[in-house]
Design a protein with these regions (language model features):
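Conserved CoA-thioester-binding segment of acyl-CoA-metabolizing enzymes
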Residues: 1-49
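Catalytic-core regions built around general acid/base machinery
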Residues: 33-36, 77-89
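Short, active-site-adjacent cap segments at secondary-structure transitions
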Residues: 52-56, 101-102, 207-210
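Crotonase-fold acyl-CoA enzyme core
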Residues: 84-196
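Terminal peptide-recognition signature
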Residues: 13, 29-30, 48, 60, ...
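Amphipathic alpha-helical segments at domain termini/boundaries
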Residues: 1-18, 154-194, 202-214, 219-227
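A general structural signal for well-ordered alpha-helical segments in protein cores
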Residues: 27, 61, 78, 139, ...
Length: 227
C-alpha cells in the first residue's frame, strides 16, 4: 500500500511496486497521505514516487467491472484527489520512474512538476484507444496542465511519450537516468519547500479555479466502461 517516507523537508509518497491502479482503497490511502503532508508544518514539499516498471496505470478497470455500484464513488474520489493535488499549498513533484498511463498520467499532471526516466517508461493517455472518453474534469485537468498542441495530440491520438519526447512536448521538465529520477525530484522539491503555503495555495487555486470547479462537478464526471 502507499506510504510516506521523509528526506529532510521533502515528503516522499511511495505509491508501490505494482501497477498502482486506482481502486477505492488505493485512492483513499493516497488522499490521506497527501492530506497528511498538507497538514505538516512548513517548510515542506511532496514527491510522489513508485518502484518497478510502472508509476501508475490509472483506474482499476477490473475492480470497477466487479464493483459496478462503486464506480461513481470511486470516480468522485479520483477527481477529488486530482483537485487536492492541483490546489495544494505544497510544492509537488512527480518522480516518474516507469509507465504513467491514463488516470496515472493525469495524477502526474496534477503535480506541479514532473521528472521522468530517460531510457524507459511511457507517458500516455490511451483513452481514445480503449473507448473511454475523458470526463469533463479530466479534460479540464489535462488541457490546463499541458500546452494546447500537446494536449490535443495526447488526448486524440493516444501517443506514447518517452522521457526525452515528454520534455520536448512540455509534459516533463527533465528526463534523467533511472537511478537519478527520485534524487533529482527530491532536489527540485527541496528547492521549493520554503514557499509560503497560504500564498502558494491561493495562487494555484485561483490559477486553476475553472479546472477545480470541473473536477468537483460529479454530474459531468461519469464514465461508461467498454463492453
Amino acid at each position: 500500500m502507499p506510504h510516506l517516507e521523509r528526506d529532510g523537508e521533502v515528503y516522499v509518497l511511495q505509491l508501490g511496486d505494482g501497477e498502482n491502479r486506482f481502486n477505492q482503497d488505493f485512492v483513499d490511502a493516497v488522499t490521506s497521505l497527501v492530506q497528511e503532508v498538507a497538514a505538516a508544518p512548513a517548510p515542506r514539499a511532496l514527491v510522489t514516487a513508485a518502484s518497478g516498471k510502472i508509476w501508475s496505470n490509472g483506474l482499476d478497470l477490473e475492480w470497477m467491472s466487479e464493483h459496478v455500484e462503486a464506480i461513481e464513488p470511486l470516480l468522485d474520489s479520483v477527481h477529488a484527489l486530482y483537485a487536492e493535488l492541483l490546489g495544494l499549498g505544497v510544492p509537488t513533484v512527480a518522480a516518474i520512474q516507469g509507465h504513467a498511463f491514463a488516470g496515472g498520467a493525469m495524477l502526474a499532471l496534477a503535480h506541479d512538476i514532473r521528472v521522468m526516466r530517460a531510457d524507459r517508461g511511457w507517458f500516455c493517455l490511451p483513452e481514445v484507444d480503449i473507448n473511454i472518453p475523458f470526463t469533463h474534469g479530466m479534460s479540464a485537468l489535462i488541457t490546463s496542465r499541458l500546452p494546447v498542441p500537446t494536449a490535443h495530440e495526447a488526448m486524440t491520438t493516444g501517443r506514447r511519450y518517452g522521457g526525452a519526447e515528454a520534455v520536448q512536448a512540455g509534459i516533463a521538465v527533465e528526463a534523467v537516468a533511472e537511478e537519478q529520477v527520485l534524487p533529482r525530484a527530491v532536489a527540485v522539491a527541496a528547492a521549493l519547500a520554503g514557499k509560503d503555503p497560504q500564498t502558494l495555495q491561493a495562487i494555484k487555486q485561483r490559477m486553476y479555479a475553472s479546472t477545480l470547479a470541473a473536477l468537483a462537478d460529479s454530474a459531468a464526471n461519469s464514465i461508461s466502461l467498454p463492453t
